[in-house]
């Protein structure tokens, strides 16, 4: 199991499930005398002061009880504040377990729109999120529809916010990146920055992964230039400790600067190459094929993929219209696929070509050709078998856990059609 795929499992498992899977249950990580970390699918941080506690991110609803249990012995006095670095489910799922009477919950102002956006499209996202981890989910049409989220925060801010608790000053900054509501927490006394998911620890210690500049499950654009600016804000603080939403602490300003600068520069490179290609008239698929990270960045694609990021940047700037008049209309290309099968003399020649493509190391072209056949006959067994082979080939050769999840989903669907288990 790759490290990236192993981390992905933790996003849906608590301590007990992790132990049953053969992974060692996590233990509390002490950062300093005041800061502890529960290293679960998403890290949960506890900052203790003489006047009470501050919790930074709360984990998923599944692993939040484990985080609360892990940190229980470190909690002395009331939980005065909960700070949410952003509104993703793996960071806000444990709010109710930490919230007490009088607890203030802090978020950046764009939090409201983010969680409402997710609630608004719950029926759309639920099966896509489940498919990413090859998990069962209700069909989209079975969701009644939910257009407003529960809003837990009691304090919102735009650009900056600060408070002092027990003599410890907490400074909060708006740092959009993975989400528009993303914030960074800076504790000057400890020279420590909590930066949420604007830096991911997937693949650490080395090599780490390129970020997920676009989430293929479906999301609004993640603006690369905002993300770059946010990393610059963190670097300008000259932190000695950086604590992220996933992965291990980074200590020492030199190492922090090296890692975050490389991370930032890789984002800048992919953004600039995409824009350069757009301005030279290249289409999105050409750029997805052409743009590769130089080896100097030493980043894997176990979490974010460069090709997905290229398309996310391209479509974020330009939208869906590709200047082909045919795409202005509601008729999809698949409407003529049955005609192509008929012109080919039936499905058999198309399936043969699909298998030839697979033998030539072109499994994605195999998938496209099986799409053509299955549009004419969704139960065509040779096409389903060719599709299963192509999906299995891609699954065997990917290092990206998100890609692996959707491939597993596709493999399962093909096997179901074939009656195989």
Regions picked out by a protein language model, each given a short descriptive name:
Residues 25-74, 184-198:
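Conserved beta-strand hairpin/beta-sheet module of binuclear metal-dependent hydrolase folds
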Residues 4-16:
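Bacterial N-terminal signal peptides
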Residues 42-44, 60-63, 87-91, 111-113, ...:
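Solvent-exposed loop/turn segments at secondary-structure junctions
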Residues 20-21, 123-124, 235-241, 249-421:
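Accessory terminal helices/loops
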Residues 34, 47, 57, 71, ...:
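Divalent metal-coordination and catalytic microenvironments
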Residues 22, 51, 62-107, 156, ...:
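Active-site metal-binding motif and surrounding structural segment of the metallo-beta-lactamase
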Residues 30-31, 53, 58-62, 113-174, 219-238, ...:
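Metallo-beta-lactamase
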């Amino acid at each position: 199991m790759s490290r990236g795929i192993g981390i992905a499992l933790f996003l849906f498992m608590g301590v007990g499930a992790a132990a049953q899977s053969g992974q060692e249950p996590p233990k509390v990580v002490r950062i300093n005398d005041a800061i502890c970390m529960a290293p679960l699918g998403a890290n949960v941080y506890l900052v203790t002061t003489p006047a009470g506690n501050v919790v930074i991110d709360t984990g998923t609803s599944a692993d939040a009880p484990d985080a609360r249990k892990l940190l229980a012995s470190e909690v002395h006095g009331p939980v005065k504040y909960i700070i949410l670095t952003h509104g993703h489910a793996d960071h806000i799922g444990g709010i109710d377990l930490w919230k007490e009477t009088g607890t203030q919950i802090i978020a950046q102002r764009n939090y409201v729109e983010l969680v409402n956006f997710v609630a608004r499209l719950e029926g759309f996202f639920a099966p896509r999120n489940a498919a990413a981890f090859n998990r069962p989910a209700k069909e989209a049409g079975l969701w009644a529809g939910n257009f407003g989220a529960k809003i837990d925060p009691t304090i919102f801010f735009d650009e900056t916010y600060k408070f002092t608790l027990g003599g410890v000053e907490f400074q909060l900054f708006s740092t959009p990146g993975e989400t528009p509501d993303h914030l960074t927490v800076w504790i000057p006394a400890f020279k420590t920055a909590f930066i949420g998911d604007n830096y991911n620890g997937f693949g650490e210690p080395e090599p780490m992964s390129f970020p997920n500049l676009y989430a293929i499950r479906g999301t609004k654009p993640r603006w690369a230039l905002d993300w770059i600016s946010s990393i610059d804000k963190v670097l300008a603080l000259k932190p000695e400790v950086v604590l992220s939403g996933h992965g291990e602490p980074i200590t020492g300003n030199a190492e922090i600067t090296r890692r975050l600068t490389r991370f930032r520069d890789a984002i800048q490179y992919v953004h600039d190459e995409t824009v350069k290609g757009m301005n030279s008239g290249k289409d999105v698929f050409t750029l997805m094929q052409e743009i590769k990270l130089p080896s100097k960045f030493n980043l894997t694609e176990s979490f974010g993929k460069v090709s997905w990021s290229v398309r996310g940047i391209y479509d974020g700037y330009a939208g869906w219209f590709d200047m082909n008049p045919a795409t202005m209309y509601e008729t999809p290309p698949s409407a003529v696929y049955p005609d192509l099968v008929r012109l080919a003399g039936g499905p058999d020649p198309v399936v043969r070509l699909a298998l030839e493509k697979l033998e030539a190391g072109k499994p994605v072209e195999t998938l496209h050709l099986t799409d053509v056949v299955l549009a004419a006959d969704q139960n065509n067994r040779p096409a389903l078998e060719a599709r299963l082979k192509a999906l299995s080939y891609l699954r065997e050769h990917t290092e990206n856990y998100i890609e692996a999840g959707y491939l597993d989903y596709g493999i399962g669907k093909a096997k179901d059609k074939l009656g195989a288990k």
